Every structure is written in structure tokens, then in C-alpha cells.
Amino acid sequence: MIIDPHIHSRYSGDATASPGDIIRKSREIGLDAIAIADHNTLKGSILAMKEAKDLDEFMVIPAMEVTTNKGHIVALGITQEIEKGLSPEDTIDKIRSYGGIAIAPHPFVRYREGLCGYVKDLDIDAIETLNSRYIFGYSNWRAKRLATKRKIPEIGASDAHFLGAIGSCVTELEAEFSVESVIKGILSGKTNVFGNRTPLQLILKEVIKKKIKRS
């Protein structure tokens, strides 16, 4: 199974695509599953799940990207929202109590609210070691080194904020088409991550589009 477990919809506030468009793009490029992990809301994820419920060989995993008081954590597999501003430890406890797993996204990218040094001893379930915005950067290398050292499962994800970036980085794992199976597959540690950097021209194009939209 090939999944992109970190995509943003327009409900994030800093992205542009609708959940429906994200599903269509994801199927077009051959993904088996996605997670829409919007900032501090499940709205985009829940809407996508409803739209995808009757699709064959494709699934949407519920998720959100929670802002803790130390940085971002992706809550994968939850259907109850978690409030922002809690400590990472309390956030992780809530994620697990709701049946999900906690992933550290772009952990060493400070300006995007990564957990940075705080992640080193944190009881996290998986680490995003390949993020399409930083594929050649030091931050991914540090994330990979930490995951290897602590034997934490690795995640690859696009962190897409627009359609053209979806699937830029992905995670490959053995799983059935169920949330429980995907979570089990990640926790097994038997994941492969691969992909390419989101082209800079696409990032700049989207930044310009968002500025025009706000003006």
C-alpha cells in the first residue's frame, strides 16, 4: 500500500484544495490511501472520509495536525478533535486514548513549528523522516538519524498545501484497507519512505496565488 499521510485542505487556513479535489488527485496519481491532516481541525478529514466511503481500493484515514505548546504533532487515526496548546505528552496521551498514533512531522524545522530538540526523548509513535519540502535538507537527515537511533517507525509525506504537491513523498507499507491495519503497519516499523522535493516553482506559484486571494 502507498499512502500520503500528511495533506492539507482548505480547512487548514493555509491551503487551497477541497477534500474532494484532493481525493480525485490522489486517485489519479495512484495512491491507495491518504490522510488529510489539517491544522487543529478534523473537518476536512471527515468530509473526505464521507466522500471516499464508497470508493474501491482507496481510503481516507482520519487525521489532524495538532499545535502543542512545543510544536506540531500529527494525530493519525482519530475521529475526535484534540484542542491545541496542550503539552506534547498530554496530546500524545489523548491521541492514543482516541485510538490513534502520534507522528512528529518535520520535527527539525523550527519555522514550521517542528518539535525540534524536544522530540529527542519524546514517546512518539512515528517520525516524518521525508517531507517533500525539505527532501535535500538537513532537517530530514536529522529526523532520519533520530528514527534510526531510537528505532522509531519512519513516515514519508508530502505535507501538501496544494494539489500539485500531493504524493511528492509517500510511505509504503503492508496493510489492508482499514484504519486499524494501516496503524498496525506503521507501528510494525516495516515502512519504506520515498519521493521527491516539491518543485520550488510550484511552491512560489501557490504563495503568489494565496497573496492575491487575500488582497
Predicted regions and their residues:
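Charged catalytic cores and adjacent phosphate/nucleic-acid-binding surfaces used
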Residues: 1-9, 13, 19-25, 43-47, ...
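N-terminal beta1-alpha1 ligand-phosphate binding loop
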Residues: 8-14, 30, 36
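Divalent metal-dependent hydrolysis catalytic cores, especially in the metallo-beta-lactamase
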Residues: 23-41, 101-103
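Short glycine/serine/threonine/alanine-rich loop segments
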Residues: 31, 58, 100, 152
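Active-site catalytic pocket residues across diverse enzymes, especially alpha/beta-hydrolases
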Residues: 52
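Ordered, amphipathic secondary-structure segments that act as subunit-interaction surfaces
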Residues: 85-86, 105
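Aromatic-lined carbohydrate-recognition surfaces of secreted/lumenal glycan-active proteins
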Residues: 103-111
